[in-house]
């Protein structure tokens, strides 16, 4: 797998608080006209905290089906625990993600002193 090139962190489109998979397909069609190496779906700006597991699966599967196999789909799978992250990463692979992007836990457990 080649991770060279530009990978766009994409926003997740919604309409009336529901996923807008048609808009996602339209956006991907436009982005695939460029030289992007791939996309990051549900990354740090992809609203991953606002979607449930089934919606995440739908987003990843829709992205994979709307893109050529030569372009990579990287899925944001970082969660608040190791167990949940492993589960999300496996689900992402099953939905068609080529790789995962795991960010660390968002909970602020460190004190100000520990951060200095």
Where in this protein do the model-derived segments appear?
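Active-site beta->alpha loop and helix N-cap motifs at the rims of alpha/beta catalytic domains
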Residues: 1-116
